[in-house]
Design a protein with these regions (language model features):
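Short, acidic Gly/Pro/Ser/Thr-rich loop/turn segments
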Residues: 59-60, 72-75, 170-173, 194-196, ...
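Glycine-/charge-enriched secondary-structure boundary and capping motifs
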Residues: 2-15, 32, 123-141, 154-159, ...
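Short, acidic (Asp/Glu-rich) active-site segment that either coordinates a divalent metal cofactor
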Residues: 160, 173-221, 225
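Acidic-glycine-rich active-site phosphate/pyrophosphate-binding loop
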Residues: 63-65, 71-73, 177, 181, ...
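Glycine-rich phosphate/pyrophosphate-binding loop regions near the starts of catalytic domains
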Residues: 29, 33-192
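Glycine-enriched loop-and-adjacent helix/strand subsegments that border the catalytic/binding cleft
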Residues: 24
Length: 357
């Protein structure tokens, strides 16, 4: 026995939670910012199935492409809580272009991926404009991207953000760390804050242990705690590329998740370690506060956070003064933070200040 069919409303993609028109509005809001990133090598325009980039480059004799991908991680939760979306785009770009930079590569182009629960054109456009601004500062084209509206998978207002960067370097100028030996000098470039790593611990400290609001003003920071934590990750191509082009940089380290203890050994040859003086650069107030509020041990801080140094260049002792002058002449702050030594039981030895005695 069959029941009578009742009249049913015709379903649409929008009724299922995917608004194509909202996606088109987002593109209209962001397209000028995206086009402003284009380099002469970019072929085609927005809207193609793939981005096109010409590799005709007479300056590089043995071209090697270097790629990197990363996301912003749980820092996004703070951006969502504060309804502030104009800074995380830079975080996304920085996490990839800084990684390819340590190979000696000049960033060429970048692609972003945003997954949202409900597509809000203004929110997505704010994120992508941040991506575009960071691409311009890094000298790379925002060649393409994808915004995926995933109704029922993410909550309304929630989103995830990831990116993919590609750069180029001459094979003879690749920075691999293989030539690092005893007596080389570590030059550190300052960070802007927490950058994009350690935010699971940050949220545990701020929201759970301290029961703070992100809008709480903190005298030591000169701003709210949320504003400080959302300070975008620093982009290092502009300060570092002139050094890479004019000197022999033996190794570079992007201080990300794992801090000093995990990242520095990634570029060191067997048998080589480093000694670092943690008093060689000013420690940012945000790290002092996180340590105090969370009662976090100092070694754990340096294993989790950048502690004020976001990028390290390792150079021959004979080049260190000239590299420091090159940076100073361009008004780039830098600090001699340590040296390479014969490796002992610990590849990374921190000394000075809280590590003395």
């Amino acid at each position: 026995m069959h029941s009578k069919e009742t009249a049913k409303e015709s379903l649409t993609y929008a009724a299922a939670g995917v608004d194509i028109d909202a996606g088109n509005r987002a593109v209209e809001l962001m397209k000028d910012a995206v086009k402003a990133t284009y380099r002469p090598e970019v072929l085609g325009d927005l809207g193609g199935f793939g981005g096109l980039f010409s590799l005709v480059n007479s300056r590089i004799k043995k071209p090697v492409l270097v790629s990197g991908t990363d996301g912003v991680g749980t820092k996004l939760r703070l951006a969502i809580m504060m309804d502030k979306h104009d800074t995380v785009g830079q975080d996304c770009v920085a996490m990839s272009v800084n990684d390819i930079l340590v190979q000696g590569a000049e960033p060429l182009f970048f692609l972003d991926y945003i997954a949202v629960g409900k597509l809000e054109p203004e929110q997505v456009a704010a994120v992508v404009k941040g991506v575009a601004g960071a691409c311009r500062e890094s000298g790379c084209a925002l060649l393409g991207g994808e915004t995926a509206e995933m109704a029922g998978f993410y909550g309304d207002g929630d989103y995830d953000l990831a990116g993919f960067g590609v750069g180029i370097v001459d094979r003879d100028r690749l920075i691999t760390g293989e030539t690092i030996g005893e007596g080389d000098i570590l030059i550190g470039l300052p960070s802007t804050g927490v950058h994009s790593n350690g935010f699971s611990l940050v949220r545990k400290i701020i929201l759970d242990r301290m029961n703070m609001k992100l809008t709480d003003y903190i005298d030591e920071l000169g701003m709210s705690v949320g504003e400080s934590l959302l300070t975008p990750t620093r982009l290092y191509p502009r300060p570092c590329l002139p050094v890479i082009r004019n000197f022999t940089v033996k190794g570079m380290v992007h201080i990300t998740g794992g801090g000093f203890y995990e990242n520095i050994p990634r570029v060191l040859p067997d048998g080589i370690g480093v000694e670092i003086d943690v008093t060689a650069w000013p420690r940012l107030p945000v790290f002092e506060l996180l340590r105090k509020w969370g009662d976090v041990a100092w070694p754990e801080m340096y294993r989790t956070f950048n502690m004020g140094i976001g990028m390290i260049m390792i150079v021959d002792a004979g080049d260190a003064s000239a590299v420091m002058k090159n940076l100073a002449d361009r008004n780039e702050k830098a600090y001699v933070i340590g040296r390479t030594v014969k490796a002992g039981a610990d590849r990374v030895v921190l000394g000075g200040g809280v590590f003395n005695g």
